UniProtKB/Swiss-Prot annotation:
Lineage of the organism: Bacteria, Bacillati, Bacillota, Clostridia, Thermoanaerobacterales
Similarity annotation: Belongs to the UPF0173 family.
GO molecular function annotations of the record: hydrolase activity
Pfam families reported in the protein's UniProt record: Lactamase_B_3
Protein name from the UniProt record: UPF0173 metal-dependent hydrolase CHY_0920
Taxonomic superkingdom: Bacteria
InterPro entries xrefs: Metallo-B-lactamas (IPR001279), RibonucZ/Hydroxyglut_hydro (IPR036866), UPF0173 (IPR022877), UPF0173_UPF0282_UlaG_hydrolase (IPR050114)
Keywords: Hydrolase
Claim: Zinc is one of the keywords in the record: no
NCBIfam families in the cross-refs: PRK00685.1
Keyword Hydrolase: yes
C-alpha cells in the first residue's frame, strides 16, 4: 500500500490500481506541496464538512470523475454540485468489489460555510480494507474507547491519527489510541499546520515505538510503501 501525506489530514492511498484521496485540503493549506489540478483519484473519502477537510473535493471530483464517499448529509450537499457520491452512515459497511469501506464514529463537528452554515451530518472516520490490508483514518476526533471494539472487528494494519490537540486528540491521547487499536503502523496527522495545533511529533514517535508500533512520520509530499 502506497501512502502519500499531502499535509494536515490529507492523504493519497494507492493500492490494487486504485487511488483513494482522504480529506483533500490543498488550496490554502500551508503544508501542501501539490495543487488540486495536479492530483486525480478514483474515490475521495471526506470525513466531515469543515473547510480544512472538505477542501478541494468538489474541484477534484468534477475534474477526475471521482466518487465521494461520506455520510448521507455531506453527500447530498455534494450531489447538488454535480459530484458523484456514495452516501453511507456511521457503522455502515459497503463492499465496492475491490475494496470495502466502513464508516466509524468521530467526536467532532461538521458544517460548511461562513455566517449561516449548512449542517452536513455527523463527522466520521474510515476503515478502508483493500489488497489484504486495513487502514483506519480516524478523521478529526477525540479519543474514545470504542476504537478498541472497531479494531477487534477489523484488525488495523495502518492507523492515521491526529496528534495536534485543541480540536482533536493530542499526543497523550493519540498514544492511548495506539494501545486501543494496536496497529502495525501509525502515521500522525493534523498537527503543526497552525500554531494552535502545534505538537511534538518526536515524542509521539518515540513513545509510540515503545508501545511496539512502527511510527512513520511523513513530511508533506513524502510517500511510504507499507
Amino acid at each position: 500500500m502506497k501512502i502519500t501525506f499531502l499535509g494536515h489530514a490529507a492523504f493519497l492511498v494507492e493500492e490494487e490500481g486504485l487511488k483513494f484521496l482522504f480529506d483533500p485540503f490543498l488550496t490554502g493549506n500551508p503544508q501542501a506541496k501539490i495543487r488540486p489540478d495536479e492530483i486525480t483519484a478514483d474515490y475521495i473519502l471526506v470525513s466531515h464538512g469543515h473547510g480544512d477537510h472538505l477542501g478541494d473535493t468538489v474541484a477534484i471530483a468534477q475534474r477526475s470523475g471521482a466518487t465521494v464517499i461520506g455520510v448521507f448529509e455531506l453527500c447530498n450537499f455534494l450531489s447538488r454540485q454535480n459530484v458523484k457520491t456514495h452516501p453511507m452512515h456511521i457503522g455502515g459497511r459497503y463492499n465496492f468489489g475491490q475494496f470495502t469501506v466502513k464508516l466509524t464514529p468521530a467526536w467532532h463537528g461538521s458544517s460548511f460555510g461562513e455566517g449561516p452554515v449548512e449542517y452536513l451530518g455527523n463527522p466520521c472516520g474510515f476503515l478502508l480494507s483493500v489488497g489484504g490490508k486495513t487502514l483506519y483514518h480516524t478523521g478529526d476526533t477525540g479519543l474514545f474507547y470504542d476504537m478498541k471494539l472497531l479494531a477487534e472487528i477489523d484488525p488495523v494494519d495502518i492507523l492515521l491519527v491526529p496528534i495536534g490537540g485543541n480540536f482533536t486528540m493530542d499526543v497523550k491521547d493519540a498514544l492511548k489510541a495506539l494501545e486501543l487499536v494496536k496497529p502495525k503502523y501509525a502515521i500522525p496527522m493534523h498537527y503543526n499546520t497552525w500554531p494552535v495545533i502545534a505538537a511534538d511529533v518526536g515524542e509521539f514517535q518515540d513513545k509510540g515505538r515503545a508501545l511496539g508500533v512502527a511510527i512513520k512520520v511523513l513530511n508533506p509530499g513524502e510517500m511510504v510503501v507499507l
